């Protein structure tokens, strides 16, 4: 047996197994860091690509990540600590609209494409479901939380994203 380099002992098959487990734990894909997966959109996307579903549930206060968004809108509601969806914009969008459809009192919290940019939404007119309409969406990764105005309310929803 040859002397190991860097004075690291040879551990054989066991070290390969440990390395494989460590790699799989640390190399978790982005979609695994959300409750309901990822959405990848390019300009001109179809209506089907812009619709996802999930359900609300949680007691994590969304305002702890930001009290107000970049437009001065208050950030409210409760959700799970993990984002519900990961949105990947492959190119810049001049305008996007995100609309929750649940029939309940929902809220929206979107963080991205950097940790400092926040967009929040609450009621839409007379409708208690949340929506956000905003301009200048840069290409990148966005974390989306769908919350409810009250803690631990479970409600099925559809999220519609439109240009």
Spell out what each predicted region is.
Residues 2-16:
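Bacterial N-terminal signal peptides that target proteins for export
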Residues 30-67:
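Predominantly extracellular/luminal regions of secreted and cell-surface proteins
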Residues 86-102, 108-109, 142-146:
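Hydrophobic beta-strand segments within beta-rich accessory/binding domains
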């Amino acid at each position: 047996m040859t002397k190991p380099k860097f004075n690291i002992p040879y551990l054989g098959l066991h070290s390969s197994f440990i390395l494989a487990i460590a790699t799989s734990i640390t190399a978790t894909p982005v979609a695994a860091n959300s409750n309901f997966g990822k959405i990848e959109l390019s300009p001109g996307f179809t209506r089907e690509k812009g619709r996802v579903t999930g359900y609300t549930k949680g007691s994590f206060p969304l305002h702890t990540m930001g009290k107000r968004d970049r437009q001065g809108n208050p950030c409210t509601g409760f959700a799970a600590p993990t984002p519900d969806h990961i949105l990947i914009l492959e190119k810049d969008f001049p305008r996007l609209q995100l609309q929750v459809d649940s029939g309940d009192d929902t809220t929206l919290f979107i963080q991205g494409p950097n940790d400092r940019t926040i967009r929040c939404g609450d009621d839409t007119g007379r409708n208690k479901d949340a929506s956000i309409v905003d301009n200048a969406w840069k290409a990148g990764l966005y974390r989306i939380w769908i919350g409810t105005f009250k803690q631990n309310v479970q409600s099925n929803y559809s999220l519609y994203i439109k240009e």
